[in-house]
Structure formats: structure tokens, C-alpha cells
């Protein structure tokens, strides 16, 4: 994967927040936070370079790029964080003001015909059959009309985190689904299993609020 484009853009958008939250959540002093960030950047670029390019129709490239960034930061920390603290750190790092705006904007189109069509197309794509760093998903609309579920049987984040030796920390990344759903303001996120915790699949259920 080329660093120019989305990977570069994501670093520009989020690196400052990742650095700030090293102090706010994980308790590193400002100098250490700067040093971690400085070390993480080449690590991030190296991870990105090892990844294949995603197909044009694959909507999950950003998910993998984000996980490459958090992976690079973890590998650059002097001490490996616990899952619960990493969960808080990752959520706060990702939920910048522009990201919250993006979630609200996405929320406005949730459950529209266009959204449903896009979800069905993603399920049909089965991108992980050709790219192990992508996702395979089945799509289910709830029979009572209350929303829908994406059920993932292959997960690019799981593959990457295993390669980085960070698989036990993957649940911290999974939890961002709840945070983003809440920020969108129109759905209640429901989940029974995750692949990262040994489940048969990872279910992402979106129920209409109210």
C-alpha cells in the first residue's frame, strides 16, 4: 500500500490526537509522548508499505489504516498498555471533532435505501477472499424492521494485529464500533460475539433508536 493518499492523510488528521491522549489517558509526560510519536511515524510507514492495496470498491481500507496507526503507537510505547486503558486511549484518540462530525453525517444516511444497497454490495464483494487484510461480511436485515446486522467472518484487523504480536489487545479496537455508533446519534449498537475474543463471527448490529 502506498503511504501517499489515505495513510498520509490519516496521520496528519490523527497523530496529534494520539500524542495528546498518551498524556491524558496513559499518563506519559509531554516529552515521552513526543518521543513515542516520533518513533511511531516510521513504524507506521513501514507497516503500511507491507500491506497490499485495497480494491476500489472495498470500504474497509480506512479501518485497516487506523489499526496500523494504533499498532505503530503501541509498538513505540515503553510499556505495553492493558486492554481497558488502551480501549479508552484509542477511543479518545480517534474521536476528534472532525471524526464526531463524520459520525453524525454518516448517521443521517443510516437505514436509507442507498445505505442498504451499499451494505449488500459490501457483503457480495467478499474482499477478504482476495485480500487477507480486508473483511468478509454477511448482511441481515432484522425482520421487525428495527435495523440490520453485518456479520463478519474474516477480519483484517485481526490478521494485522496477529502479525504485529498485538492480538491480545485487539478487543480495544473492536470497542470503537460502540463509540462511533453513539457519536452518530441514531443507532444503538448491539453485539454478541467478536472474532478477537474467540467468537464464531463478529456481529455488528445497528438498531434504530427509540
Enumerate the predicted regions with their spans:
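C-terminal edge-of-domain segments
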Residues: 198-208
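Charged/polar, low-hydrophobicity segments characteristic of intrinsically disordered regions
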Residues: 25-31, 54-57, 99-113, 190
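A short catalytic or substrate-binding loop motif that flags glycine-/basic-rich loops and adjacent residues
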Residues: 131, 197-198
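N-terminal, charged low-complexity regulatory/assembly segments
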Residues: 1-77
Amino acid at each position: 500500500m502506498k503511504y501517499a493518499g489515505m495513510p498520509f492523510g490519516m496521520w496528519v488528521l490523527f497523530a496529534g490526537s494520539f500524542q495528546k491522549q498518551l498524556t491524558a489517558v496513559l499518563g506519559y509526560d509531554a516529552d515521552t509522548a513526543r518521543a513515542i510519536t516520533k518513533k511511531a511515524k516510521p513504524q507506521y510507514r513501514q507497516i503500511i508499505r507491507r500491506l497490499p492495496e485495497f480494491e476500489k470498491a472495498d470500504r474497509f481500507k480506512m479501518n485497516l489504516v487506523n489499526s496500523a496507526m494504533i499498532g505503530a503507537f503501541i509498538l513505540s510505547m515503553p510499556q505495553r498498555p492493558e486492554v481497558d486503558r488502551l480501549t479508552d486511549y484509542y477511543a479518545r484518540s480517534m474521536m476528534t471533532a472532525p471524526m464526531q462530525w463524520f459520525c453524525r453525517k454518516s448517521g443521517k444516511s443510516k437505514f436509507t435505501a442507498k445505505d442498504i444497497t451499499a451494505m449488500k454490495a459490501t457483503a457480495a464483494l467478499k474482499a477478504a477472499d482476495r485480500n487477507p487484510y480486508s473483511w468478509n461480511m454477511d448482511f441481515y436485515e432484522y425482520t421487525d424492521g428495527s435495523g440490520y446486522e453485518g456479520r463478519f467472518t474474516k477480519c483484517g484487523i485481526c490478521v494485522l494485529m496477529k502479525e504485529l504480536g498485538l492480538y491480545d489487545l485487539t478487543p480495544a479496537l473492536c470497542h470503537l464500533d460502540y463509540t462511533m455508533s453513539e457519536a452518530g446519534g441514531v443507532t444503538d449498537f448491539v453485539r454478541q460475539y467478536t472474532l478477537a475474543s474467540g467468537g464464531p463471527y463478529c456481529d455488528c448490529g445497528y438498531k434504530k433508536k427509540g
